[in-house]
Amino acid sequence: MSRMTVLSPSAGSQSACSLGLILVNPRRPLRSLSILFGLWKALIFLVIVICPGLGYDTSTSLLLYPTRDLSDVDPLHFPLSLRFVRWDSIYFVHAAEHGYVFEQEWAFGYGYTRLLALLASVLVLYRLSVNIFGGDTAKQKTLCFLSAALHIISPAGAFLSAPYGEALFSLLNISGLYLYSSSVLDAATNHRLSRDLKLLAAAVLISAATAVRSNGILGGVLFAYDALLQLPQILSRGLSLAVVSRLAVIVLGGCVIALGMAVPQYIAFNAFCMTSNAPRPWCGWTIPSIYRFVQEKYWNVGFLRYWVVPNIPLFLLAMPILALLLRSAFWAWRLPSVTSKFSENGANGALTKAMWLLPRLAIIQALLAVLAFTSYHVQIINRLSSGYPLWYWYLAAELISDFKNSQSTNKCISISAVAVQAIMIYGLIHAVLFGSFLPPA
């Protein structure tokens, strides 16, 4: 008589639990985050490639067949790689292949087409989180891990897998913030040379992020904040060598960030305004800016220009992320009560670290939300938000708090958990829309 092995329910749950520990284990963050990243990206990739046909908009096919009648193109022979070339990525790919040929292509970050990088911002975000909140206690490790995991399922969705600027911007901006936070920690231990070198390195990365996406210029708030911190010392003690040298490093860092915006504009000015042809209208502006001109002319971007009735659905689509950005910015101002949750047994390391940086990041994130609401195509905030870590920390802290409360109150519904589920569902739905070249962009 043959023997049949039957797994008990408890054995099945143990196997599932073991699998869960492999996938989500804050004690092994690098491995766990890499596995989660691979699984989520594979799912997004699968959803996009199974979308049938050329898509609602057939502009992508012009990259491959610029002179052919699209009715002759067999969708089955359409390269899978071009399924990721949708919306603005058509401009990125064309500029990467041929350079900046058309005026409107200058609306898309000059830095991106000159440097294509793999997305590593998830792991950098984990290290940044450790710098801010510490990584000594189980609660701190969980917060840092969850924050990085949330970055994987960012509402940017398919844009982080396609030839768009969001992935590289996230990497550069978060890496810049990591070096900036390391500079702050060195300042606390009086390592001045290391502090200044890391501050300048952070400025270089944020400047590169600005060359990829113009909203990176908001990183200059960090340096403006640092400069203002020097004023009380100057007023109370007067100028000293230490204060002057510190202020010089801060101002130099701010100028480096400004170069990320100014250099592409200078290159465009030479290309369009210093020729024998009739100069473009923007060449005569007090501060010539091809970026501002093409945004206004070709995309109708400007203060309250997007506030028209047909765009109401797009505002509704953006509202959850806008609310999350503003709510988490306000959360960061409640610094003592927030960081004390992660300072156990009288330890104040997390409080000291977060006190230096969270309010500054709150200013940046709040400015981004206000600009998106008043002056951008508002729906792009769903992807712009991917490069700003504050809301990841807020949502991770809420998940931890809700889980703790559910254990004591037997409450099953968690608003933070529902928010995470909504982000994941949105990411999958957006992958379908993206693969079919359907809005929103």
From Swiss-Prot:
EC code: 2.4.1.-
Keywords in alphabetical order: Endoplasmic reticulum, Glycosyltransferase, GPI-anchor biosynthesis, Membrane, Transferase, Transmembrane, Transmembrane helix
Disulphide bonds in the chain: none
GO MF terms, alphabetically ordered: alpha-1,6-mannosyltransferase activity; glycolipid mannosyltransferase activity; mannosyltransferase activity
GO terms for cellular component: endoplasmic reticulum membrane; mannosyltransferase complex
GO biological process, one term: GPI anchor biosynthetic process
Topological relation to the membrane, as annotated: Multi-pass membrane protein
Keyword Calcium: no
A Pfam family the protein falls into: Mannosyl_trans2
Known pathway: Glycolipid biosynthesis; glycosylphosphatidylinositol-anchor biosynthesis
Enzyme class, broadest EC rank: transferase
Transmembrane segments: 4-24, 35-55, 115-135, 143-163, 165-185, 199-223, 249-269, 306-326, 361-381, 418-438
Compartment list: Endoplasmic reticulum membrane
Signal among keywords: no
Function noted in UniProt: Mannosyltransferase involved in glycosylphosphatidylinositol-anchor biosynthesis. Transfers the second mannose to the glycosylphosphatidylinositol during GPI precursor assembly.
Family listed: Belongs to the PIGV family.
PANTHER family in alphabetical order: GPI MANNOSYLTRANSFERASE 2
Protein name in the entry: GPI mannosyltransferase 2
Organism name: Aspergillus fumigatus (strain ATCC MYA-4609 / CBS 101355 / FGSC A1100 / Af293)
Lineage of source species: Eukaryota, Fungi, Dikarya, Ascomycota, Pezizomycotina
Gene, per the UniProt record: gpi18
